[in-house]
Amino acid sequence: MIGSMGLRIPRATSSLLGRAVNAVATNQSAVAGASIAAQRRWQHYLMPLRDNFEQEGIRNFLSPGSVNMAYTEYQTFILEKLNALVVGTDFEQKDTKSIVLATARDPELAHVFNHASMAHNNHFFFDHLSPVPVKMGDKLFYHINENFGSVDTLRDEMIGTAVSMFGPGFVWLVRTQLPGQPVALRVMATYLAGSPYPGAHWRRQEMDAQTSIGSSPQGLSNGQRFFERSAAGFKGNKLEPTAPGGTDLIPILCLNTWEYAWLREYGTGVGGMGGKLAYAQSWWNMIDWAKVEEEARLETRILTGGDSSV
């Protein structure tokens, strides 16, 4: 029987405490080292977004919870799938864009293409957003007016294309240039995980902003050709290695129309409230136009009369 004296618990000596602290530190270092090693082993891991989007959200556009779902959770899911598909292959140490271009013409690697392209597109979308409104630069403003008539026309075209898409995908603003022709800007849409890059043209799953499938005879023929070559591709036919015409095309902005990006925040849009339209309209106000202009690599124009203009 112990009685009122109770049990005596000896104090830990300083040496014991020191060993314990060192053990904890060693264990933490081992965990951190394992994490770094895992990232090095797996080339494709979640890239942190700038401006603390995950913690603070994107003002007047997406809450932290929506960013977490649309980027942190979804991107992690896609990258885990991609890593499982490419482990032990040459693609393991290639970036997602390189994988997209390398697999787009091989029907047997369609599953690899889809995951790589989706990861690339989703990150591209978030990487061109800003926590505060950014003024459009003069050079980009000039080229948009040259190609679309006005900034408002470009806005309406991108938002209208997004809203009219029946299935999920991405709406892109691209810089394009044919051999011997001046630089042009155009809007294009890709369905599902389709890619805008010329090297992946057979898997663009494209709907041109000028003609949606089914809206005109030309649209019907475009849609028919897409489905025909998709069916042929999955029979094992190899597709030609480069895009016809040698078009130089660079995506400089995109809008994600997949429901995981907007449904949580904006709802279905029933009754005319919220929905994809409200999401697209809010997106336009938070574009990082400085980044768009930088990636567009636009040249200064010289107007008649000797006046220089961007």
Curated annotation (Swiss-Prot):
Pfam families: Sod_Fe_C (PF02777). Its main location: mitochondrion. It is found in: Mitochondrion. One of its GO terms (cellular component) is mitochondrion. Keywords: Mitochondrion. GO terms for molecular function: metal ion binding; superoxide dismutase activity. InterPro entries: Mn/Fe_SOD_C (IPR019832), Mn/Fe_SOD_N_sf (IPR036324), SOD_C_sf (IPR036314). Signal peptide: none annotated. PANTHER family: 37S RIBOSOMAL PROTEIN S26, MITOCHONDRIAL (PTHR43595), SMALL RIBOSOMAL SUBUNIT PROTEIN MS42 (PTHR43595:SF2). Component of the mitochondrial ribosome (mitoribosome), a dedicated translation machinery responsible for the synthesis of mitochondrial genome-encoded proteins, including at least some of the essential transmembrane subunits of the mitochondrial respiratory chain. The mitoribosomes are attached to the mitochondrial inner membrane and translation products are cotranslationally integrated into the membrane. Belongs to the mitochondrion-specific ribosomal protein mS42 family. Component of the mitochondrial small ribosomal subunit (mt-SSU). Mature N.crassa 74S mitochondrial ribosomes consist of a small (37S) and a large (54S) subunit. The 37S small subunit contains a 16S ribosomal RNA (16S mt-rRNA) and 32 different proteins. The 54S large subunit contains a 23S rRNA (23S mt-rRNA) and 42 different proteins. mS42 forms a homodimer, in contrast to the mS42-mS43 heterodimer in yeast, building a large protuberance adjacent to the mRNA channel exit in the mt-SSU body. This is Small ribosomal subunit protein mS42. It comes from Neurospora crassa (strain ATCC 24698 / 74-OR23-1A / CBS 708.71 / DSM 1257 / FGSC 987). The gene is rsm26.
